[in-house]
Structures are given as structure tokens and as C-alpha cells.
């Protein structure tokens, strides 16, 4: 890449930072936005070329944001400094999409409402997480909690952990959600069995299970809509 074009050789109005300042961030493509985060390229490679290489290696922006420290630093020319910039960007994205509702009530009226709340965070996880969303009698979210990490099965997912927290929060209803790191949200037999077990326990406790949402990479499935609840 000895003859690679340097950023200073690109017409000023076409450089990522200048384009953003002149025309707005929404006019930049993913490579240009990532270039602004990374700031500089590597030896023999300008920052736009580096950004394009990363996007190509990880098959798009979602792959870059899902990459681990080891994944990123395995790329030639990428040290811990640049890797930390990418990891920080990914974490900010997750936190932005995570439920942070100190100043407003969030009411869950449909599976789409819940998916919009948690999909951005959970679709990027590489490990299965079982999250419980606690609601009051008006379906307003009063809290969330990750109650289990790892592959779900009925022998290790205990309803008592879920309902203990629900009682502590005076929750009238709950929704459970977990992700499939494979990207396919199709429910397994274990997913269905866990759902039915929690539903039965909820009926005994007087705390209604409204739904079980399974999050995949590009979508979600509601077990209520599938007729299991």
C-alpha cells in the first residue's frame, strides 16, 4: 500500500470530518463515520481504507460492533488503542438502546414495544441472557433484571429467582426475554418448556406472564403470538 492515498490528498470537502461538519452526520456512510471515530490510519493505509478493511473483515457495521478485543487486535495494524475506541463505541450503542427510563414511563402494549426497548442491546450479545421485565397493573415498566446467563434449560432456570424479584418489586405482571446468539430467534423445545413452567408458577403466585420474547440478530419472535402463552 505504499501508493495509498493519504487523507490530506483527498479534496477537503470529501474528507469525513469536513463532510460531517458541512452536510451533517446522516450524509456519511458507515466507513466515513467509523473513520471519524478511529481518527488515523495505519502505516501505508489511510483511515478510510482502514475503516473499509474492518467493515469487510467483520461483514458490516454490526460485525464490527460485536467484535471482541481479541477479534479486533488480530487485524494487522490494529493495536489496543484503536480497538478500545471501537469497543467504547459498541458499548455506547448498547447503553443508548438499553432501558434508561428515569424521566418517563414506558408502557408495553405489544411485542413490538418490548423489542424496541431491548432489541439493540440483546441482539449484539454473544452469550444467552434471560432478562425479566417487571410491570405494574397498567403495563408500565417498573424495572428489569438479568436473572440468568448461559444456555437455557429447565434444570437450571429456576422460577423462584424470577418471582422473588417480582414480589420485591410489587410487580403485577412480567415479561421474559432472551437472545439467541446464533441469530435465529426460532424457539427451541427448551424455550417452550421454560415458558410454560414460568407461566404455571405465575398463575400460582398471582403474577401474570404476558409474553416471552426471543431476540435474534435481525428480528424477534413472541411466544404469545405463537400461541404458547
UniProtKB/Swiss-Prot annotation:
Keyword Isomerase applies: no
Keywords: Hydrolase, Metal-binding, Metalloprotease, Protease, Zinc
Annotated binding of Zn(2+), by residue: 178, 180, 191
Motif JAMM motif per UniProt: ranges: 178-191
One BP annotation, GO: proteolysis
GO terms assigned for molecular function: metal ion binding; metallopeptidase activity
Chain ranges of the MPN domain: 107-229
Family membership noted in the UniProt record: Belongs to the UPF0758 family.
Protein name: UPF0758 protein CLL_A0562
Origin species: Clostridium botulinum (strain Eklund 17B / Type B)
Organism lineage: Bacteria, Bacillati, Bacillota, Clostridia, Eubacteriales
